[in-house]
Swiss-Prot record:
InterPro entries: C-type_lectin-like, C-type_lectin-like/link_sf, C-type_Lectin_Domain_Fam1, CTDL_fold, NKR-like_CTLD. This is C-type lectin domain family 1 member A. It is found in: Membrane. Disulfide bonds join 164-256, 235-248. It is a single-pass type II membrane protein.
Length: 269
């Protein structure tokens, strides 16, 4: 075997050799070389992980900051929009109240204008015995808020009722003093013509009712009844300013009435 060292000097020059002087013999020992772990030191392993976590934390913080900024902007925008909506609601409420006030004033002006037109038209109508401003059909008489027609045709009571209905009217009704003052003078005739009214009863002793179902007022006028006549006298006529109970099958003239229309201001000229 070939010796590792050719001389003592060579052995001394070797850093890996140690001489023991205490034992009196030369003992050569080799310094153990440091072993490196295959996986490296712990610090070298955790450093990338820590950097990654730190990066993620920074990204998360930036995201939270951006989200907070967006939320703050949205909150400000929401408050601005809410204030704008509230302001618009207040303006809309004020405009609505103003519109209602203007509509009320407009209705009042229209009513006033209509009252003036009716008054003027009535003066023209009464002065000339008729005028184109009249709210009644041609040949109908205008009194109060109604139109009246006293026909010359003679029919029984039931036929007169149908006759009036066909003309968009009803049989004459006298329920106020004003209507009585107007209707009775129309009944004066030199030829004994009387007019059926809408008052009748369903047999002797029963209540007198108008065609609309309202009761007859005994205080307004008296119905003259002939107790000696055996025939049923359950329908009322007017003749020479008085009311009479007559047989409903007798032939009398028809008196009809209807609600007057509106006076057209343009027809006052």
């Amino acid at each position: 075997m070939q010796a590792k060292y050719s001389s003592t000097r060579d052995m001394l020059d070797d850093d890996d050799t140690t001489i023991s002087l205490y034992s009196g013999t030369s003992t050569v020992t080799r310094r153990a070389e440091p072993r490196h772990s295959e996986n490296g030191t712990p610090s070298s392993v955790w450093r990338p992980v820590a950097l990654t976590l730190l990066t993620l934390c920074l990204v998360l913080l930036v995201g939270l900051a951006a989200l907070g900024l967006v939320f703050f902007q949205f909150y400000q925008l929401s408050n601005i929009q809410q204030d704008s909506i509230t302001e618009k609601d207040e303006k809309l409420g004020n405009m609505s109240r103003q519109l209602q006030s203007l509509q009320a004033q407009n209705r009042k002006l229209i009513e006033t204008l209509q009252q003036v037109a009716v008054k003027l038209c009535r003066e023209l109508y009464n002065k000339s015995g008729g005028h184109r401003c009249s709210p009644c059909p041609e040949k109908w008489k205008w009194y109060g808020d109604k139109c009246y027609q006293f026909y010359k045709e003679s029919k029984n009571w039931q036929s007169c009722e149908y006759f009036c209905l066909a003309d968009n009217a009803t049989m004459l009704k006298i329920s106020t003093q004003e209507e009585l003052d107007f209707a009775m003078p129309q009944s004066y005739s030199e030829f004994f013509y009387s007019y059926w009214t809408g008052l009748s009863r369903n047999g002797s002793g029963k209540a007198w009712l108008w065609t609309d179902g309202t009761p007859y007022s005994f205080e307004l006028f008296e119905i003259i009844i002939d107790p000696t006549n055996l025939r049923n006298r359950d329908c009322m006529t007017i003749f020479n300013g008085k009311a009479y109970s007559k047989d409903c099958k007798e032939l009398r003239r028809c008196a009809c009435e209807r609600i007057a229309g509106r006076v057209v201001p343009g027809e006052l000229q």
